[in-house]
Amino acid sequence: YTDRASVFGVPIEGGIPERGIYMARLTSHWMAKTNIVVPNHFKAFIQETNDLNQFLKEGESFQLPENLAGRCLVYKKIEPLEADFEVWGYLTGPAWKEYSETGNVFGHPQISGLLQSQCIPGSILVAFTTDAEGNRKQLSDDELVELTGPKLLEDIKSAYVRLYNDIQRALRVNGKFIVAHMKLIFGKDRKKAYIADDILTPD
């Protein structure tokens, strides 16, 4: 994880000092904490320069450069799904905009009378693909089934509900926080769904 960052696609000159360190810590924390709820591809957080040796054959060794220690994670290799999944639990941003105009949230009808930033009953999972020009397209249920297959899609839907609810409970108890919107990337291995990339890191 590097210190590079951007806002709405515009790079921040010089990045954010130590951002990569905190991104690695956040990801490793939530990957380890939620692995019982939903399996993910996380294997280890490399905090010391010799931590990679545990993955090498006997007699082999590798010394990680000091500037990379605390910024690297080891992941299980899985096949990524060509879609970004987003969980929306509260009426903010584009979710509120669509609801205030149509009564829907990403095409899903909602009860009337909800207020801005209010909890969405049940929360919503949506998926997007991004083309070469950076344009995003929301996938329909039929397109999702074509991408993942029906069994894997059901596993993903079940996983996001368990994961989102577990994280919400943990944050309410420990920090009085809520998660209004969460991006998830899924992959698969032997027809089983795994959380990939990051969990609860600020993008």
Residue ranges of model-derived segments:
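A long amphipathic alpha-helix within ATP-dependent nucleotide-binding catalytic cores
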Residues: 147-180
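Catalytic activation segment of kinase domains across protein kinase-like and atypical kinase folds
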Residues: 184-203
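Active-site loop/lid in soluble adenylation, ligation, and acyl-transfer enzymes
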Residues: 1-130
